[in-house]
């Protein structure tokens, strides 16, 4: 049975505001939304005081409201509170969104710029004497069933697809950029779903492009509600609500039910800073002012706390960055106030710790989430909190009968501190050095002070670089952080390196990437060599252009990648850490190499990192395992290898070949070769 979260339970029959700040009595402002005249507005029906039932907890029972709430009716509401923002002026009162809102409604603001101070009303439905979460049209959404563990891919066989909401399509004046919706994402998995804003794109309307790719874990860039419409959602405002611009909660549930259980949902969460209502309702309890030495005369700076360790990043590498929001406060003395998790009167941790556990509770139990990616751990800068959060995620997962190898908490900390893994603070890290090594290798360079051979060795086997298990390392050629030198999309990187054979190099990169030890993560669009449409400085707006997938050469890259994805997620040899290098050709500068993954029915990769084909009709690779077997296959070309040619096939320049004797069958309760058209 799942743990009870007291604050969330209370909301079923009451309007509840948890605010440990000292303040005057908050008020509920409640009404109904009328769509006409456009853009619509909320008509106020009731204004009344909340009562303090515990220190820091304010409530108003729904059955005490007069006139009585109507059954089966949708209501919109705000809380009116003291404005605690450090530089606030004026009346001292402000209407705020319920910090726990499951749905928010921006319709009354129409096309107004969404300033950080904008507070949309929360939405709730009154039915049978209780308050029910609902969409703005009144639809009540059932929670997603717990993932069926026998059908969930294990961590060591995941292939993650990192998908932003910003997409591009052709318009009358060139490229038109828009945000995809949950329905558009569903269309990438389901041919029967046409999508909404991108139905004009063949890859969205006629194909199930991501299903065809074959990934089995989807990481949508933050889907909790953000006020900003032109970015990827790293400015979370309403942590419990799906992003209103991406669609309704019902459409999110439709998406999840389409992809699960065979595809895992990874939740991307931003907890270094927020744009949430507590900035106004209880600033000093939940937030702190960021240090800004470049603007010492900014009025906010007199409220900054240079003596507080909470103001600095991990390892004191400089001030934390709020990126236009407000930093979450993670260091604060215990308070004799309401604990929203236990319901007791003594809060043992800073309020932000409990707030973040509360929305974690919501997402894991209501949406079947089976993994987390925590953004910018060094900017959160509190490893004790991260472990506290991770431990609760695992408690929730295990309470629903979850398997130990079918849930994961991944952290983004680009200095890759392995102590976060050995201490149990996190399960995995983004393996940032992998990106540098693979990009160096495909242009014939070494990286990180190693020679070329060791650049490739560490790229292929992360256990040579401090990891103790491949499931601790999330590898990527490209991530959504496409800003900076050698971080851009693969197409742009190769173009900037004056590479003319981009298709060949991209295939080489993916052959190494999808056979390496670690969890592979594909940034959306890289599977067909998408390119950047915007200036590199606009990384959180740069769109994915699925129209490009129809280019002939890009379709070839896509099919090549899909073939290897199918192998990666199904072949047992790629789900273990066992790796041995059997050949380094010193006569060619150590740049033709061969390595073996796994022991039983292994995978052998032979790669040529030079601009020269191997000479002669044969290229002999010594130490080839099971050379006498007659069932070797080359995966990327989907062909059998004649027994006389095992370990002897030539290589073209910048080419990798991937061999195995393994054949598709039942593995871990799953049927292999799901994407049969791409299977090797």
Identify the residue ranges that each predicted region occupies:
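Active-site-proximal helices and loops of the catalytic beta/alpha 8
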Residues: 222-224, 232-235, 258-263, 359, ...
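Core domains of carbohydrate- and sulfate-ester-processing enzymes
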Residues: 85-148, 281-338, 448-465
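The feature marks proteins involved in alpha-glucan
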Residues: 1-14, 55-160, 168-180, 184-187, ...
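Substrate-binding/active-site clefts of carbohydrate-active enzymes
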Residues: 146, 151-155, 164-367, 377, ...
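Active-site clefts of carbohydrate-active enzymes
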Residues: 472-498
């Amino acid at each position: 049975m799942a743990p009870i979260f007291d604050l969330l339970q209370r909301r079923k029959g009451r309007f509840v505001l948890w605010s440990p700040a000292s303040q005057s009595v908050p008020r509920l402002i409640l009404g109904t939304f009328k769509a006409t005249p456009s853009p619509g507005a909320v008509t106020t029906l009731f204004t009344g005081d909340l009562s303090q039932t515990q220190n820091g907890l304010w409530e108003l029972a729904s059955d005490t409201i007069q006139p009585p709430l109507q059954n089966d009716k949708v209501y919109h509401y705000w809380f009116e509170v003291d404005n605690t923002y450090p530089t606030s002026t004026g009346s001292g009162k402000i209407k705020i969104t319920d910090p726990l809102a499951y749905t928010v409604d921006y319709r009354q603001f129409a096309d107004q710029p969404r300033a950080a101070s904008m507070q949309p009303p929360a939405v709730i439905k009154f039915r049978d004497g209780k308050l029910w979460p609902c969409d703005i049209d009144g639809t009540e959404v059932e929670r997603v069933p717990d993932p069926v563990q026998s059908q969930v891919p294990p961590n060591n066989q995941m292939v993650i697809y990192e998908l932003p909401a910003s997409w591009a399509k052709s318009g009358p004046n060139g490229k038109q950029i828009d945000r995809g919706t949950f329905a558009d994402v569903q269309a990438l998995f389901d041919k029967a779903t046409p999508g909404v804003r991108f139905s004009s794109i063949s890859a969205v309307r006629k194909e199930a492009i991501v299903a065809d790719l074959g990934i089995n874990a989807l990481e949508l860039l933050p889907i909790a509600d953000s006020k900003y419409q032109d970015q990827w959602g790293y400015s979370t405002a309403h942590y419990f609500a799906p992003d209103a611009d991406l669609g309704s909660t019902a459409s999110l549930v439709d998406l999840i039910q389409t992809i699960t259980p065979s595809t895992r949902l990874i939740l991307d969460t931003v907890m270094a800073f927020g744009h949430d209502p507590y900035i106004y309702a209880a600033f000093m309890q939940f937030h702190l002012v960021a240090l800004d030495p470049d603007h010492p005369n900014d009025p906010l700076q007199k409220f900054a706390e240079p003596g507080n360790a909470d103001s600095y990043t991990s390892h004191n590498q400089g001030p934390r960055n709020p990126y236009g929001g407000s930093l979450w406060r993670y260091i604060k003395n215990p308070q004799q106030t309401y604990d929203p998790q236990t319901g007791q009167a003594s809060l043992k941790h800073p309020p932000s710790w409990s707030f973040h556990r509360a929305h974690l509770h919501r997402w894991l139990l209501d949406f079947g989430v089976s993994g987390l990616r925590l953004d910018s751990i060094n900017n959160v800068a509190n490893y004790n909190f991260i472990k506290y959060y991770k431990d609760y995620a695992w408690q929730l997962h295990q309470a629903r009968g979850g398997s130990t190898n079918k849930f994961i908490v991944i952290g983004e900390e680009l200095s890759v501190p392995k102590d976060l893994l050995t201490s149990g603070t996190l399960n995995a890290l983004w393996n940032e050095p992998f990106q540098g090594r693979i990009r160096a290798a495909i242009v014939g360079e070494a990286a990180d002070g190693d020679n070329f051979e060791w650049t490739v060795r560490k790229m292929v086997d992360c256990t040579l670089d401090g990891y103790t298990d491949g499931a601790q390392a999330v590898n990527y050629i490209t991530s959504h952080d496409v800003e900076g030198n050698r971080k851009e999309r693969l197409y742009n990187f190769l173009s900037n390196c004056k590479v003319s054979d981009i298709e060949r190099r991209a295939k080489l990169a993916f052959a190494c990437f999808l056979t390496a030890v670690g969890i592979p993560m594909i940034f959306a669009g890289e599977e067909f060599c998408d390119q950047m449409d915007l200036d590199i400085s606009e990384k959180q707006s740069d769109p994915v252009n699925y129209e490009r997938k129809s280019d002939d050469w890009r379709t070839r890259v896509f099919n090549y990648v899909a073939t290897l994805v199918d192998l990666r997620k199904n072949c047992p040899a790629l789900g273990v850490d066992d790796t041995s290098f059997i050949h380094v050709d010193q006569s060619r500068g150590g740049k033709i190499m061969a390595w073996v993954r796994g022991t039983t029915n292994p995978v052998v990769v032979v790669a040529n990192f030079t601009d020269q084909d191997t000479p002669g009709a044969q290229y002999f690779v010594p130490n080839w395992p099971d050379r006498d077997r007659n069932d070797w296959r080359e995966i990327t070309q989907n062909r059998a290898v004649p027994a006389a040619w095992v370990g002897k096939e030539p290589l073209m320049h910048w080419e990798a070949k991937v061999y195995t004797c393994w054949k598709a069958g039942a593995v871990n309760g799953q049927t292999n070769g799901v994407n049969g058209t791409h299977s090797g």
